Amino acid sequence: MARYTGSVWKKSRRLGISLTGTGKELDKRPYAPGQHGPNQRRKLSEYGLQMQEKQKLRFMYGLNERQFRTLFDKAGKMKGIHGENFMILLESRLDNLVYRLGLARTRRQARQLVNHGHVTVDGGRVDIPSYAIKPGQVIGLREKSKNLDVVKEALEANSFVPEYTSFDADKMEGSYTRFPERSELPAEINEQLIVEFYSR
């Protein structure tokens, strides 16, 4: 299944969650798109709820189905709670951490920065968005990329970096200091529903 490239705002409204991380998609019309507007009601089955939760998380991190399932299966082989491990693996992706550090305004923008070779890990260029970052590794930008308008705008707009990261504004680089706790990850996601979906 290909990565979704349609209207992120419509998808956000349909799933009831901000996929860009800005929340702007739900400001004016916090209900699913369609002619019935806020009055439309549709009760989902158990399977429907599980599917919806999977889609919410998949679209939030911008993965296609194959990438998403591969990471889910990898999490199942780790010690600990399957769903939490899965969330941590998603959070440890390079594109996500570029976004978390404030070097990009959205994960989609962060993915483009990585794809175009602007991002470094421990001083070396890495152009693989799915690259798994380990605690202690340093994420930065190539020298010529530090003047990109999209980066400057993102840094100006960002006022928060997670406690499991650190950021040096002068060097425009940050570290993944530790794996996050579940309480530090998206509260609007019920990962157990995703585990149940793939266990059917």
Swiss-Prot record:
The gene is rpsD. NCBIfam families: PRK05327.1, rpsD_bact. InterPro entries: Ribosomal_uS4 (IPR022801), Ribosomal_uS4_bac-type (IPR005709), Ribosomal_uS4_CS (IPR018079), Ribosomal_uS4_N (IPR001912), S4_RNA-bd (IPR002942), S4_RNA-bd_sf (IPR036986). One of its GO terms (molecular function) is rRNA binding. Residues 20-41 are annotated as: Disordered. One of the primary rRNA binding proteins, it binds directly to 16S rRNA where it nucleates assembly of the body of the 30S subunit. With S5 and S12 plays an important role in translational accuracy. GO terms for biological process: ribosomal small subunit biogenesis; translation. Keywords: Ribonucleoprotein, Ribosomal protein, RNA-binding, rRNA-binding. Belongs to the universal ribosomal protein uS4 family. Part of the 30S ribosomal subunit. Contacts protein S5. The interaction surface between S4 and S5 is involved in control of translational fidelity. One of its GO terms (cellular component) is small ribosomal subunit. This is Small ribosomal subunit protein uS4. Residues 92-152 form the S4 RNA-binding domain. Pfam families: Ribosomal_S4, S4. PROSITE patterns: RIBOSOMAL_S4, S4. The keyword Ribosomal protein applies.
